[in-house]
Amino acid sequence: SSAASDVYKRQVSSFGSYAYSENEDTFFIDLYAGGTVKTEKGITLTCETDFPHGGTAKYTIKGEAETTVAIRIPAWSEKSLLTVNGEAVDLNAVTKDGYAYITRAWKDGDTLALTMDMTPHVVYASAKIAADSGKVCVQRGALVYCAEEVDNGKVLPLYVKAGAEPKALDFEPETLGGIVPVEICLLYTSPSPRDV
């Protein structure tokens, strides 16, 4: 419909305001999107990334300015590594409210690189929501994998084995427009395969 098309156009045209924001003293990186952006302080950041399938986002600086760059450290990444010009930054010392704040005199060619933990893990639904009680999904980075009955038929007799650790497989560019499949051990508890 025309209305849906207009909403899509507005969202696409406003993507930059979701990816980056800026106030008088800090430039915020909210999303790890490839491309180039110029700050009000006069430096330009170019991002090379393999996100969301990979866990790296590297920003190369062009220009010079003394300012703060704050990059979002995602809560799902248990072991993030942030470097400036290849040297590790102590995230505990610079992180506040989910952002790592780096204040320095940025110079032409400086790099800011974030490596995120992409280890897949099982996420259990809240028991407070009766309809979801006992259900799980697998999360790898920002992506959530699940098998829903509407897409897969009756999957209720399948259970994630206690202590099962999901494993990420190799990237498959032709599957679902490109995806890293995740493998996990399931238990089948129905007496007959016909029940699935």
Please state what every model-predicted region is:
Residues 1-62, 95, 104, 111, ...:
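C-terminal beta-rich recognition modules with glycine/proline-rich loops and embedded aromatic residues
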Residues 66-74:
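Surface-exposed beta-strand/loop patches in extracellular or lumenal glycoproteins
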Residues 77-103, 122-128:
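Solvent-exposed beta-strand/loop surfaces of large extracellular or lumenal domains
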